[in-house]
Amino acid sequence: MKVRCLQTTGEGFFKEVEYEKNEPAQDEIEVRAVMTGVCRSDIDMMSGDFGPLPLHMQGHEGLGIITRIGSEIHNVKVGEYVATRGEPAYADMYNVRKDEFVPVPTAHPRYILEPVACGIHLISQNLNEFQTRTGGRVLIIGSGFLAWVARNKLLDYHFYVDVLGNHNINLWGTELIKSVKENYDIVIDLSGKYQIGTDIKLNNNALIIDAVGKEVSRGEAEQQLWRACTTVRPSPRHKNFINAMWDAKNKIQMGNLDVDKFWTQAYNRDTEWQQAFADGMDRPNGYSRGYIVWD
């Protein structure tokens, strides 16, 4: 089946192309796109700072309606809404493998679960590492959406948390700091702008969550080696990421996590998709996260 898809090759823009969608496999569902979030990584890919990924991997913050179900899938039905991690979510229709989708009650941007799950997964992918440091001091570098979700997840445990950043001051209040004076047991790096171990002081056996793929300098490496640090890199391709998606759904549905204020702008797929990526790049006043809507 040939369908439309939005693609970037890293030349500063997205374009509409034709995508050949295969028949869904026995362990897949077919979905029709309803909403897809514009991720910062898509903007980085557009500007040439990342990738570009092949066409079949473009768009990953999906919400769709099921149109067909493989014979090995038994927990959903045709016509049901699902949040997807599968790709390409910028296509009009796409297939999603089992354990890469979660049924949701309605087509509302709060149920674009993949980016929420990314924030939760910063903690849950290596939960045992956090648990062995319970009661320690945590630094989150960055004050955007992922930082806020990660901070919310940390409320399930007992940590002293600082958030280092300059954005969303009204959201964070006194929890937001502009410089650090403490030594930390855990650092969650969503920025890549600081030297972890030199600019940011660490305690022995510290845990570093590198969420940006930062290049480590020699000075950092020496300090991290001296302090016997552990570094992990969370990924939505981890086998347990689906658990973070379920956690995101449950927190949102139960009212324990309010993400509505972050989804600030919707864009019509037929007439406004180019503006969606332009605003993702320029981030006009009041913009937090945008999403594309199919009729």
Locate predicted features.
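Short glycine-/small-residue-rich Rossmann-like dinucleotide-binding loops
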Residues: 37, 44, 70, 191-192, ...
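C-terminal hydrophobic helical "lid"/dimerization subdomain
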Residues: 242-295
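Glycine-rich beta-strand-centered segment in the early N-terminal region that forms part
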Residues: 20-37, 47-88
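Hydrophobic/small residue at the entry helix of a nucleotide-binding pocket
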Residues: 118, 145-146
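NAD(P)H dinucleotide-binding glycine-rich loop of Rossmann-like/cofactor-binding domains
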Residues: 81-140
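Glycine-rich phosphate-binding loop and adjacent beta-alpha segment
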Residues: 191-254, 295
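Adenosine-nucleotide cofactor-binding segment
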Residues: 121, 134-143, 151-198
